[in-house]
Regions:
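A short, well-structured juxtamembrane/interface segment
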Residues: 41-56
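Internal, active-site/partner-interface "lid" segment
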Residues: 208-243, 248
Length: 269
């Protein structure tokens, strides 16, 4: 099958520097809506991916995201939200970005060209066939991600990918692929825009639904949320009051008993 980089295609919007701010805002918003439409088309693929991640998580496996640039940062962002939101240990959902931590703050473009580095990074986390790895790359060609996913398949580790081009090299090494075709970017080739938006929406679904299936949500409440600041402490108190029908004093007492998170007070007995 042929491979064509839609993500590098010429923008549908011309002479941007000659447009008014209002025109630019409306044009970008129109393209953002196209990202939503693209995600809508791949919901069955997202469903299939999550249905295959969930058993791994439930059996004690881990979820890894690997990516470079914006794609890698989005994976790290999604992973970093799991401990405070769902009470998971930091090693349960892990985001790896080409170039490591410095790449979160500044662009280290050369780091993405190493085919073997992602596997080294995964090996540092003692990756096993009980884990699941998702490669994130708008183009689907990033060597860091392609090499990492290929090595995972070679070692019988389940894989998925989130890409914005069809029939990409990365898709070849994904057991479960999500090809979310957002079309040309507003700014030609700037995949941090629509592609990044679509990737973030899909990552939201992957982590949130996986955690729901793993028992970290009751009703629509985050029952394993970490009470790490005043805002979250108030939220925890409100959840306990609503779920158990107790007053604020009793909720505070239960919070003190639970010490760390709110799952025990809110679980049915």
């Amino acid at each position: 099958m042929s491979f064509y980089k839609i993500t590098e295609q010429e923008s549908n919007h011309k002479n941007l520097e000659k447009k008014s701010v209002s025109e630019l805002v409306n044009a970008m918003h129109e393209e953002d809506n196209n990202a939503l439409k693209a995600v809508n088309k791949v919901l069955p693929d997202v469903t299939s991916l999550i249905e295959n991640i969930a058993p791994k998580i439930k059996e004690g496996g881990r979820l890894f995201y690997i990516g470079a640039g914006t794609s890698g940062r989005l994976g790290v962002l999604d992973a970093s939200e799991c401990p405070p939101t769902f009470g998971t240990p930091p090693e349960k959902v892990v985001g790896l970005v080409a170039g490591g931590i410095p790449a979160l703050y500044s662009s280290i473009e050369i780091a993405e060209d190493d085919l073997s580095q992602a596997w080294k990074d995964l090996s540092d986390h003692n990756i096993t066939d009980g884990d699941f790895v998702i490669g994130i790359a708008a183009s689907g060609t990033t060597p860091y991600v392609v090499g990492g996913l290929k090595a995972c398949q070679d070692n019988n580790i389940s894989t998925g990918c989130i890409v914005c081009n069809e029939n990409s090299p990365l898709s070849k090494y994904a057991d479960f692929k999500i090809e979310v075709i957002v079309g040309p970017e507003f700014l030609t080739g700037s995949s941090r825009l629509k592609a990044g938006t679509a990737q973030k929406l899909i990552l939201n679904m992957i982590s949130t639904i996986s955690m729901i299936l793993d028992g970290h949500v009751r009703g629509n409440k985050m029952i394993d949320m970490q009470m790490s600041n005043a805002k979250l402490n108030k939220r925890a108190r409100r959840i306990i009051m609503e779920e158990l029908g107790v007053n604020e004093e009793k909720a505070n007492e239960l919070i003190l008993l639970s010490l760390i998170h709110i799952s025990e007070p809110t679980r049915p007995y």
